[in-house]
Amino acid sequence: MPSRNSNVLQRPTYAQLASTSVKSSKGLVSYQDWVVDVKASISAISVNKSRTKVGVAGRELLKVLAVNPNSSKPPVCISDLLQKSTQTKHISCNDVKWGSSFASNLIFTCSPLGNLNVWDVNLEALLYDFNEHSRAVHKLDISSFHPSYVLTASQDGLIKLWDYKESSSTITFRGNSEAARDVVFSPSEPNEFVAAYDSGILQKWDIRFPKLPFLKLAAHNGVVLCVNYSPNGVFLASCGRDKTIRIWDSTSNKKKSLITINNVSPLNCVRWRPANQQSRGSNQLASSSLVGDTAINVWDITRPYIPYRTVSCHDSIVSTMHWASTELLWSCSKDGIFSQTRVENAFNCIDMLPRATSSWSTKNSLVFSSNPISNQRLSSLNRVASFESNISSLKSALYASQNSDGSTSNPVPFVPHNFVGIPQELGILAYRSEDVAQFCYLAKNYRISGDISSACKENAFFARNVGAEFAYQIWDALYFSLGVLNNSDKGISELINIPFVSANNSMADDEKGRNLKNLTQISTSSTPAHDNLSLNDFFEPREASTPSESSNSSIESEDNLDKAVLNKQSQWHDLENPIVLKKGQAPVNNFSTDSRASINSSYLLDSAASNYSGTSHNEMFNSFHRSSVTSASIKSREAVLSAGNSSRRASIFLDQLSLHGDTDSEIPIDDLPPIELPYVVTSIISDCISRGDVQTAACVCSVFSYLTIDLPRIQLDDLLESYVDLLRRFGMFSEATLLINMSGSKNLKYIHSSSRDLIFEMENKKATGNEQSEKGKENAKTVTSLKKCVYCELPLRGVLVYPPVCGHIGHESCLRSWYFDNTDDALPVCPVPGCGVKLLDKRALI
C-alpha cells in the first residue's frame, strides 16, 4: 500500500468548518450598526450588569467581548476562555448567564453533556464543574434576588436549583413531564420561577414547595422552546414549535392566555423589549424562528396580527437575541454572526399593506375602507416607512403626486415616532332590497334539472315575473334556440308558431300563477298595428324607392326570398334600446311576441358569429351590423325582426347573410358551418360573465352541463363556486347543494364533498375478502405509525390518501399533484423508494 502523506491536514474542528461557511457578500443594511464574526456557531449571549462586557457561547465557543462606549462601533474580543486550557478546549455551551452582585466576575454555562460550569473571567479559568443531570442541559437562569442561586433545565425532565458555593444541587423539581426546555426566574417574585416542557406545558413553581407546581398551563400544542418575563414581571411570553407566541398574565392564576400571536414558522426565542421613559416598549417583544425564516419580528401585543417591525440582517437562522437598550437589538445566528440593529429604522410591515380593503359583514353588506381621494391631502403627506426602497405602490403614488408639478424632491428619511398616518374612510355598500328579493326568488324557483326545453321555458317565466329583463332574454333565447335546432326538418311556417314564454302557457302550477297574476298580464293597449305581418313583409327589393312602393312589394316564395337576400343588400333593423321594468309593473310591448323574436335573433347571430374564425368573418359580421342587408320597408322597420330566426333554415340563412354581407366575400355557401347549440350557449355564458350576472351564467352552465362549453374549465368552476358562495351567504343551502350536484363539475363536487379521500387503483389483481381485511388492518396500522408524507416528508395533516395494497400514505394534494403531473408514458410507480407498486394509467381515471 502506498504510504500516507505526512502533509495531509488534520480533520478540521466544527468551529473551523463554521468559520468557513458561506456568507452573503452584501454589506450592512441601512439600520445595522455593526457585525462581528466570532468564527463559530453561537447559541447564547449574556451581558454583565454594568453593560461593559458580553459573553458569547456556542459550539466550542466561549468568548468575552468588551462593549464599546460608542454604540455604533462593534465590541472587541478580550478573552477566549476555552483556548486557555487543553481540558476545556472542546467544551460546547448551550446557554450562558453572567453573574451579578458579588458574582459579577463569574460566568455560568451549561453543556450538552449535562454539566453546569462556573468560570472566572478575571482568572480566565474554570472554577466549578457540576454534573448531576443524566442528559443535556438546555437552559439556565440566575436569580436577581439571590445571586448564588442557579436553575438548570435538562433533557431528563428535571429542574435543579444550585448554590454554586455548595458541592451539589440544593433542590430537584420533578415536573413528571417530558424534557425541560427552558427555565426563568420571576423578576418580581423572589421565590417563583417558570419551566417549559416538551409536552407544551408551562409549570410555575415556588422554591419553598418543591414537590408540586402551584400552577400548570396547557400553553402550546407542541414543544415549548422559550419563556421570558416582561421587565416589570407582569406579563409572561412563551413560544414553541406550534408557530405561536402566547402572552400570559403572571399576576393571576388564569389558565387562558391573554393574547396569541401567530407566526409563519416555528419559534425558538422571544425577548421582551425594555421600556423607555414613556413606557413605549412595555408592550413589545421580539421573536426569531427555529427554521425557515431568518428575520426577526418585533411585535406589539396591542396589534398581534402584523409585526411592528421586521429585522432582516442575517443569512442564517437566528439563535438568540438580547435588547442592549430600548432602541438597540443584539442578535446572533448559527453562522457565527453577532449583529446590532436599530429597530425603529427597520422595515415597517404596515407600509406593505394595501390601504384599501373590503369584507362582507354579517348582514350581507360590503364593508370597505380606503384612503380619501384628495390630491391636496395626499400631497401633504411627506413620509417614508423605512430605509427599504420600493416598498409599496402607495409610496410611489405619493412621490408621483409630490413631483407632479415638475419639481424634483428626494425621499425624506424616516423619523421615528413622528410619522403622519394616512387618514382612512370607512363605508358600507348595502344591497338594494329589491335586488336581494329578486336574487332569492330566482334562486329558489330556477329549474336546473329535468327537461332542458321546459327548464328554459319556466326560467324565462320566472325571470319575466320579477322584472329580470336580461335573464328573461337569455332564457327565452335559449328556449327558442332549442326549438329551432331540434326542428330543423320542419318548414318555416311551422316554426313561426313555436309558442313563446308567456304567463298563459308556461306554468302548470296554478298557485304560482295566481300569486304572480298581477305581474304576468300583458298590456294590449300599446300593441302595434303591424302584429300580423307575414315573413314577406320584412324583405323587399332594394329598387323600392318610396315607402308606398316598398309596402306593396313582396316575395312570393322562400326561393325568391333566398335569392333576393343572397344577391342583394338589405338593411337590418338594429334593436338596441334597453328594456326597463319598474318594480311591480307588468312588461308591455317590449316583451311582446315580436320583440321576443328579435331577442332570439340577436343571440343566435352573436353566438354564431363569435365562434367563427378568420379576420374576414369578423369584418363581415361587423359590416353586417352596420348596414349590409336588404333594405326593409318602413313598416318592417317599426316592427321588431325577425321571424326568419324561427327555423333552422332561417338561422343558416342569417348566418350566410352575415358572412356574405361584404360584396367582396367569395365564401362558398356549402362550406359555411352550421349554427350549433354549444356555440349559442358558450356565447350566452360569455355575455353573462362580461355583464357580471353570476346567477344567470351559473344556471345556464348547470342546465347545459351535458354540452361541451368552449370556455376554460377553471373559469367555469370559478363561476359555479361564486354562485354557490352567494347562495350560502343568503342561507339557501339546499339550492347550493342542488347546483353542486347538477353542475357536472368534478372539481366543484370534490371541493364540497364530505369525503375527499383519493384511493389509487392498482395494476395487481383484486385481492380476496380475507386478503382485503388483512390489508385494511395493515393500512390502519400504517396510518397510526407513519407521521410523514411519503412525498413531501412533512408531518401528516389534513386529508390523507394512500394506494391500496402498499398503503404508503401522503397528503392528498401532494399525491394528486405527483400522480397527475407525471408525463411519462410508463405506469406511475409509488413514490416510496423500493416499493415498486405500479398504479393504473391515469388516463383511465380522468
From Swiss-Prot:
One of its GO terms (cellular component) is vacuolar membrane. SUPFAM superfamilies: RING/U-box (SSF57850), WD40 repeat-like (SSF50978). InterPro entries: WD40/YVTN_repeat-like_dom_sf (IPR015943), WD40_repeat_dom_sf (IPR036322), WD40_rpt (IPR001680), WDR24 (IPR037590), WDR59_RTC1-like_RING_Znf (IPR049566). PANTHER family: GATOR COMPLEX PROTEIN WDR24. Residues 541-560 are annotated as: Disordered. WD repeats lie at residues 88-129, 132-172, 175-215, 219-258, 262-309, 313-348, 624-663. This is Uncharacterized WD repeat-containing protein C4F8.11. Residues 544-555 have a biased composition (Low complexity). Keywords: Repeat, WD repeat. One of its GO terms (biological process) is positive regulation of TORC1 signaling. It comes from Schizosaccharomyces pombe (strain 972 / ATCC 24843).
